[in-house]
């Protein structure tokens, strides 16, 4: 799960620099964490980044990982992302 998250964040960061400052990245992370967003909705959001079946499968697997988490874990991921956005390393962006 961690590897998939890193790969998705790396791919999206190529599209726009975040720190937060990138509404697209923030929206994707929010939709990734949100258990109310289905895998179909999630794929529609990321359609412009999907080139092949391998990417589609990776996106499905990433979303499924988050759908299988408890509310507490999802809440902790939100806190973690906010800590990253607020970190001094992201001030550079």
Swiss-Prot record:
Tissue distribution of the protein? Mammary gland specific. Over-expressed in breast cancer.
One GO BP on record is: androgen receptor signaling pathway
User: Where is the protein localized?
Assistant: Secreted
Keyword terms of this UniProt record: Glycoprotein, Secreted, Signal
Superkingdom of the source species: Eukaryota
Tell me if Signal is a UniProt keyword of this record: yes
Positions glycosylated per UniProt: 53, 68
Q: What span is annotated as the signal peptide, if there is one?
A: 1-18
* Protein's name in the database: Mammaglobin-A
Source organism (scientific name): Homo sapiens
């Amino acid at each position: 799960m961690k590897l998939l998250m890193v790969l998705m964040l790396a791919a999206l960061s190529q599209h726009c620099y975040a720190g937060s400052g990138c509404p697209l990245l923030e929206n994707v992370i929010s939709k990734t964490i949100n258990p109310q967003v289905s895998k179909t909705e999630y794929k529609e959001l990321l359609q412009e980044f999907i080139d092949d079946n391998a990417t589609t499968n990776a996106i499905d697997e990433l979303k499924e990982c988050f759908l299988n988490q408890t509310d507490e874990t999802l809440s902790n991921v939100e806190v973690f992302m906010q800590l990253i956005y607020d970190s001094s390393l992201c001030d550079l962006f």
